[in-house]
């Protein structure tokens, strides 16, 4: 197993330093998003990109239509209501099972100093891997024309690493604090404005090797279609606040094509 210092640029990102952690937490709490530029070392980034290319043949590809809330359609409302309007998402994915045992991704995911940093910034007591064999580390591929449609997350946070930028497109866009899920305030009017292009959205600039923490439960967000021949590659590091949690079998079939 590689030392963490071979994977993370600890000079630029001193994840064990309390002041650095506090600064990161303040940024995330204020903006709902945190980008740490050059988080991965150049060597780790190159290795992960190569692993992604070598295992791309094992990716499960799926395209789906869904509403922004990622919920079943509400038959009591019109089809053109914000609650029911459909958007498209399409991508490929390899699962934790395809990530090599010696991958820098696995070392990073399992590293206690990294988890301690995440807990401090996200205000979580502990973070645990998924109990199933597929969900903890995923690498997503978006080829030309593939995109992630507008949606809200069901989870309170997302942790990602951009591994390969496309030639164009593949932009992450979001509107923060558009709903209040805990209070059941869905803000249908605001969602309609975003879907109709009548409301300003924020781009979240990220480069290859950057770590991104994002709170997407109340922030509507999307990734625009990939343009050009270079595939967008993004790693998702998924943790749970409780132990022994597995993604449901139905969700695994939807996301991975198997259980």
Where are the regions a protein language model picked out?
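Catalytic core of Fe(II)/2-oxoglutarate
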Residues: 174-177, 181-259
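A generic secondary-structure signal for well-formed alpha-helical elements
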Residues: 56-60, 122-125, 243
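Hydrophobic residues positioned within well-ordered beta-strands of beta-sheet architectures
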Residues: 36, 157-159, 233-235
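Non-heme Fe(II)-dependent double-stranded beta-helix
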Residues: 2-24, 29, 38-113
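Short beta-strand segments enriched in hydrophobic/aromatic residues
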Residues: 40, 163, 239-241
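Aromatic-acidic/polar surface patches that form glycan- and anion
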Residues: 37, 41, 107-110, 152, ...
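Catalytic core of non-heme Fe(II) oxygenases with the double-stranded beta-helix
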Residues: 98-106, 115-211
